């Protein structure tokens, strides 16, 4: 991970659901700061090689490289993501990590239209690092 070492507590040191929620909130911020700034290298450190990304509009993407390529081609400079305040839910997955559920908004620079969608993200803690293993992004539409 080099320059992108994680500062989020490991699953083995988290003692409460509140601590887990703080950790996953920090991970979500790291992930989408990289997404919003097109930091593909950082983004790549936060997802597993066999990532599965399910999207209601574009279908299934399997693998880190196809996912990062899609971000480069379709997202960089075209879309920014914002977590809807108060929407985040985090639940422990024993011996694995956590499930993150929430609502996010997507802004297109120079366009007043704002999209909104729901998401479920599985975070795995393995070998001293948190990484996204599965994502379901669904119910995309205009902001409600």
Language model features by range: what are they?
Residues 83-86, 101, 113-120:
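Short, surface-exposed coil-to-beta transition loops
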Residues 6, 116-141:
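Short beta-strand edge/turn micro-motifs at domain boundaries
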Residues 2-49, 144:
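Short, low-complexity N-terminal intrinsically disordered segments enriched in polar/charged residues
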